[in-house]
A protein has these predicted regions:
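A conserved beta-strand element that flanks and buttresses the S-adenosyl-L-methionine
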Residues: 150
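Conserved beta-strand signature within the Rossmann-like core of class I S-adenosyl-L-methionine
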Residues: 172-184
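A short, conserved alpha-helix within the catalytic core of class I
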Residues: 158-171
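Conserved acidic residues
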Residues: 86, 147, 173
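Hydrophobic adenine-recognition pocket in adenosine-nucleotide-binding enzymes
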Residues: 154
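Conserved protein kinase catalytic core
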Residues: 119, 159, 184
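Histidine-centered active-site/metal-ligand motif
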Residues: 157, 186-191
Length: 253
């Protein structure tokens, strides 16, 4: 297992870069109301596929979300298992905040998402920070052969989560992804995930890690290749044990 690597998290940098990029077009209220303004923009658009290719609201939404540090535990699980210098793919990258942290920590990061305002901003951020990294368009060719691929808070946006996992598994030796439990009042941008079935799919692989974070986010890391019956049994046991432990802790509170 690689030595512990500290990621440099600077939330103020997220806002500062967006301000610089947008200049006079920057709207502080949209950053402060990052969720509401995105919901409003989606309602006005009315077409999910078009929305993901045209949204400017995601510039604010993803910036504000990055500033919370919510995904830092996800990244720390990755760097515990994959050393700097490894080739990793940020799949569904948005504005690229996660991959930028990894790139500055010495990883060979590549990005993939639809061509949209978020990836145009990402290209600016890479140049602004003096970094070079490919930004692949999901509508075109996305390469494989990566040491690891991750997709954080992405799978709940797709129509077929199992096809999505297959896309990740084809591209890297290690897959890291999180599954969000549906909650009442969920945003219209999220599809309810069959979490139990997705965890069952993962358990048929060699499980490297499983954690339940933030009360509803099932984070899994697993090998994409074939595995033995014994390893599948171990993987299922680890998932069951973690869920039982978390449920017991929640009931004790």
């Amino acid at each position: 297992m690689p030595a512990r690597l500290d990621l440099t998290f600077r939330p103020e940098r997220e806002e500062a870069e967006l301000r610089e990029y947008l200049g006079e077009r920057f709207e502080l209220e949209r950053l402060q109301r990052y969720h509401e303004q995105l919901e409003s923009e989606f309602a006005d658009c009315g077409d999910e596929a078009a929305f993901y290719r045209t949204s400017t609201g995601y510039l604010y939404n993803l910036t504000a979300f990055a500033m919370t540090g919510t995904k830092l535990p996800y990244l720390r699980e990755l760097v515990r298992r994959v050393p700097p210098g490894s080739r990793v793919l940020d799949y569904g990258c948005g504005i690229g905040s996660d991959g930028l942290l990894l790139a500055e920590a010495g990883y060979r990061v590549e990005f993939a998402d639809f061509g949209n305002p978020s990836t145009r901003y990402l290209r600016w951020r890479l140049e602004h920070r003096g970094l070079q990294a490919p930004v692949h368009d999901l509508a075109e060719h996305v390469p494989g052969g990566f040491d690891a691929v991750y997709a954080f808070d992405v799978i709940e946006h797709v129509d077929d989560p199992f096809a999505f996992l297959a896309e990740l598994e084809r591209r890297a030796h290690l897959v890291e992804v999180n599954f969000l439990e549906p909650v009442p009042g969920e945003t219209a941008l999220h599809h309810d995930l069959p979490v139990a079935a997705l965890l069952a799919h993962v358990s048929r692989h060699s499980l490297s890690g499983y954690r339940l974070l933030h009360g509803r986010s099932h984070l899994v890391l697993y090998g994409s290749g074939p595995t033995s019956a014994i390893q599948r049994l171990i993987s299922r046991g680890r998932i069951v044990a973690e869920r039982v432990m978390r449920r017991g802790a929640a009931e004790a509170r």
